[in-house]
Amino acid sequence: THYFSSTKSEKIALFNNVARTADESCIIFTTYHSLRRVVDAGIDIDVAYFDEAHNACTKQFFVPVAACSNFADRSFFFTATPRQSRRHDRGMNNTTVFGNVICNVPAPELINNGSIIPPVVVGIETNADRTKDSAAQIDADTVSNIIDNLDDNQAAKVLVAAPSSRVLGRMLGQSDMIQQLKDRDYHVLHITSKFGAYVDDRKVNREEFFNTLTAWGSDPSKKFVVFHYSILSEGINVPGLTHCILLRNLNVVEMAQTIGRVIRIDRNDAADIASGKLTPGQCQFYRKSCGFVSVPVHNNYGAATIKRLQNVVDAIFVKGIPPLALV
């Protein structure tokens, strides 16, 4: 980032003290990984906001989150996928750390008031047998085939959840998938903790990657496919994403978070709802009426994934049940 940044506690404390001495507000953004550095800085915190707060329930992050919640004057936790525990104190049902639930909005209400759009699960049947040795080639062919069946009249912006960094690396480097996508006028982006971030053939830093993703997501004429293993599934707000392809089975939280990437309402639809041109909840009249989640079903793989996915979608978006998970 081009803003001042540091993960050294003494520099964080110095930055905060300078701002306070100048009677200026001090806003600190941190990842959960670096939160302990802020805690170690020993600064006074008026308000702490924890986004994607289900991450706070992991062994790695719970202690600094609990410490921050304890000494901050006020703390607020936001998540679409709460985690609870019956065996230890790391669950979000620990009111000492996470407080009481002050707002819980069911997904059907969000659809009806024009905040999100509904997801549609699409099973893509193939005649292939997916094995460890053939996984990369089968998955590469599957992505190309799904892309071929998308609507030519609307520029598609596709998120692909890869089975692993290893398989993704082989899909990108040992098949002709990238060329196949280029021949179809699609840009290709991919990001993993192992290989870093790429825009087409160019390696970029994370800031440029996400800025490009946001800009292209807002451009109606841009067609792109973005591949990831796990780094994108949470907290990435790209309203333009229209399709998601699940190449691997996910747990409930990961499924719900991945679905959430493609059900953001189109910005022009949001503007028309605000002006009264569109009625909230009448999604059939939106430019982007739903978010598609495609799951390949091979001869020996995929049937269980699509069944679990449909159950998760029905529970969240039809019955209004939050996707609770145990930690």
Describe every region a protein language model picked out.
Residues N55-I116:
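Post-DEXD/H (motif II) to motif III coupling segment of the RecA-like Helicase ATP-binding lobe
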Residues D23-V65, H228-S230:
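Conserved RecA-like ASCE ATPase "motif II neighborhood" in helicase/translocase motors
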Residues N100-G169, G173:
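Conserved interdomain linker/interface between the two RecA-like ATPase lobes of SF2 helicase motors
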Residues S165-T192:
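Conserved helicase motor "Helicase C" RecA-like lobe of SF1/SF2 P-loop NTPases
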Residues T1-V39:
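Inter-Walker segment of RecA-like/P-loop motor cores
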Residues D141-N149, A155-L159, S164-V167, N300-V327:
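Long, largely alpha-helical accessory region at the distal end of helicase-like NTP-driven motors
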Residues N55, F195-L324:
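Conserved RecA-like P-loop NTPase helicase motor core
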Residues I28-T31, D73-A80, V225-H228:
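Structural recognition of the conserved hydrophobic beta-strand(s) that form the central parallel beta-sheet
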